[in-house]
A protein has these predicted regions:
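Active-site loop->helix "elbow" adjoining a glycine-rich segment at hydrolase catalytic centers
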Residues: 10-13, 23
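Flexible "cap/lid" loop of the alpha/beta hydrolase fold
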Residues: 17-22, 26-58
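Conserved alpha/beta-hydrolase catalytic His-Asp/Glu region
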Residues: 40-45, 57-113
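Catalytic active-site module of serine/aspartate enzymes centered on a nucleophile-bearing elbow/loop
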Residues: 141-179
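Conserved loop-alpha-helix segment in the C-terminal half of the alpha/beta-hydrolase fold
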Residues: 118-155
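Alpha/beta-hydrolase fold nucleophile elbow
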Residues: 1-10
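Proline-centered loop/turn at the N-terminus of a beta-strand
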Residues: 5, 29, 118-120
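Short beta-strand segments
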Residues: 8, 34, 122-124
Length: 179
């Protein structure tokens, strides 16, 4: 596979941007779904408090509580929510802590400024400050927002997310030159 469109959710979206910023010649485009770019200070503070909790012996309970309370809407499907919470709680502590810490420590501004490939950000909620900052640094950024789903919008309203990605691929990606 050459020049893939890299699609990532949450940390995966941050990784997609990092790939485009560092190795844009290898990436055709990126799609970041619910990636926490340019988080506002209250969110940063909440995550730092959560990081302190998951560094301790009760990390699985802290993780379950945070995911249950912060990443879902009241209307999100209960069974799916429980499956996600339990699967995420299986993540080993030595993986969970640095993964979350790195989402917020990576230089989003440098990554956005260096991104030269088509980029789509699909958010579940309104993040005007984050989107404005991203667009300031990456003017070609396209943004979509799902309706009626929380952080796991790709699982809760996949038709909305997939439709946005499909349209992005049709309109923003030029066909590859014949090999």
């Amino acid at each position: 596979m050459t020049h893939p469109v890299v699609v990532g959710h949450s940390l995966g979206g941050v990784i997609a941007l990092a790939m485009a910023a560092r190795h844009g010649e290898l990436v055709r485009a990126i799609v970041a779904v619910e990636a926490p770019f340019f988080p506002p200070q209250p969110l940063r503070e909440a995550v730092m408090g959560f990081l302190d909790q998951i560094r301790g012996p009760g990390y699985r309970d802290a993780q379950r509580a945070f995911v249950s309370n912060a990443l879902f809407l009241p209307t999100d499907e209960t069974d799916l929510k429980q499956q996600i919470v339990e699967r995420m709680a299986r993540t080993p502590q030595h993986v969970m802590v640095p993964a979350l810490a790195n989402i917020f420590s990576w230089d989003h501004a440098a990554g956005a400024a260096a991104c030269r490939v088509p980029a789509l950000l699909v958010n579940a909620g309104d993040a005007p400050g984050s989107v404005a900052r991203f667009r300031e640094l990456c003017p070609h950024l396209l943004v979509g927002q799902t309706v009626g789903a929380g952080h796991f919008n790709q699982l809760i309203v996949p038709d909305q997310v997939n439709a946005m990605i499909e349209r992005f691929l049709v309109t923003a990606i030029r066909p590859a030159a014949p090999i």
